[in-house]
Amino acid sequence: MSDDRGALSLARREGLPDALRVLVAEYPRECWEGHRNLTALMRFWLERHLIFRELEAALLAETRGLLAGDREPREFAAQLARLGNAFLGDLQAHHGIEDLHFFPRLQRLDTRIATGFDLLEADHHEIEPRLQALAERANALLAAIREGAPTADGAGRLEAELLRLQGFLDRHLTDEEDLVVPVILANPDADLD
């Protein structure tokens, strides 16, 4: 799904609509960490989100290092392959688990926010082409490095793609957290296994 979602598209959305913020109003972020209903599974899930943000930031820093001449191309290539594979593979697996297992169960817990999980799944479809473009830019740059070709243009394209994805991904992860964590806090007996 792409920008046909209008104002709810990741490209345009500045946050969840008010109708989907009812539970985060009851359970604001400030209370999550110490809340008795924040399960080990939720802590793990939030940690995964942090890791995705950190991996993307590391990819951007490495790319900027190459552009600035602070990174030797072969060292950069090894880091790009390692970080890129972890980021893309883990994020796609994470989204798959959410779409097939997690969201359908959460959707049934509170009808007031049920459509929010459809929105999050649509986000995954909107993010997927950005992930594909990132992989293509990274692979093109890796090929240039292997061939000993100049890297500035390829690194610039990779940086631009990382910046595009960063906005989409941060908006999605933040909105996802604002839906998922409060519904779990409000429903401590929810079966997510």
Where do the model's predicted regions map?
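Small-residue-biased structural context
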Residues: 1-193
